[in-house]
Amino acid sequence: MMVGVVFGLHRLFFCLYVYFYAYIIYNKSVKGSEFMNQLEQIVEISAAGNGVLRTSEVISKGISKTTLAKFVEKYNYERISHGIYCSPDVWKDGLYLLQLRCPKTIFSHDTALFLLDMTDQEPLQYTVTVKSGYNATHLREDGVKVFSIKKDFFELGISKAKTPFGNEVFIYNPERTVCDMIRSRSQIEIQIFQDAMKQYIRRKDKNLHLLMEYAKKLRVNHMLSKYLEVLL
């Protein structure tokens, strides 16, 4: 009788052992499969972002920070700033990365001219415009030229353009950029300023009505009229 009970208990414990062992193996297999699937997802996100990963975007796909950290370490991604990583296999797009780091900036003035094909000169430093009151100390420390404007005019003429690397960034449209150049003419090289005005007049998509509308709002309409009299 006792032998039967012992044998029964032994068999029960053996079955439980096999069950839990199988359960652990299954879990590891499933988790391993899920982990690989998540890595593949991160690769796809990186490819779609031209080699750039944002933590917020990865997490929004249901991928954990731990998995992202392992991916970044495994594939030697460089940390550009908090929550932004760049693949070692791509050229770093400074314009795109700057706006990812500082999304409250708009590329303006000579940087906008460059992206709008209104100058042949690649800017020596990036130029952005921010709302008045924005703390731009970190930008200036990074060598970025910063202009500020009242919030009422900050969004006037916002547009999009592609960087030389094909990434999309926010800039001001040609009409707003011309007005900005006039407003800040004392801080702009005269040759760049004159060439920009000539390039604008040559544009097939120029909108003189919109230009004058912006000029009135930004209070440069009288100065603009003088330049247009010479150029038109």
Question: What is each model feature region?
Answer:
Residues 30-35, 39-48:
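A detector for short, charged/polar N-terminal pre-domain segments
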Residues 67:
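Residues in the helix-turn-helix
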Residues 38-41, 51-57, 80, 84-232:
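Nucleic-acid-binding surface
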Residues 3-5, 10:
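Targeting/processing segments of secretory and organellar proteins
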Residues 13, 17-28, 32:
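Short, positively charged and aromatic/hydrophobic N-terminal segments
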Residues 70-75:
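Basic amphipathic alpha-helical segments that dock to polyanions
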